[in-house]
């Protein structure tokens, strides 16, 4: 059986900000998996736990896997996105600062490990009911696209490219990285979604010959950036479509009860959709990802050489 080597790093013991890195194996390639960069991350933490339990039962690993189940301990405990200590969102300050605030020092310590990894998988729990999907800079970088296309989830969605995000900064540094956003409520675990993501990641490890087992070739639809559908009136929103369904501009996706229909202004696929609830004018009730119908795996990316990879560590 493979035993985890635990490395506990104290960022700020007074606030309980200690990062626990669990390493399985010591060889290359290395995969870094992290979860809970914010509160409301119960499902992605559980998925990382399931991956660790699987690795512990293996006889050997040809490579190494490092797992950080809770990347932002204080925010995770409080169920918040922004730290109450410095008003910073961890996933907006990478690569961090060794001498900075608690959140910046946390990002710096994670970045130290991330910059040495061969692959990075960032687990997140969606704040709206969603299809579990990959988010990555797959249109800009072929090293990212190659990983995104090997994670056996239905969609790989182009990320926003926000600077300071781990997904953006690592991709710019030449590191193959994807985020996985999964179904789950803020304070409850969606065990089915956690298992689905665990299986997708374990299959990726098999494709890279890190662990043994049957390999499943993935079929991933690449999409552009997510588009939001907002409501223009207040009331009870009732969805009239299902997650994963294709939509065209003008299709009805739901209604504001006793008032009006909510239509999609975009073509694409429904990736996230609000359950029936009370909404206010301007609220986001769904997100649509436009399919890249003209994509061919053999095509080079125009911007692949526009940014030279540079490694800081």
Where are the regions that the model predicts?
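Structured catalytic-domain cores with a bias toward divalent-metal coordination
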Residues: 1-313
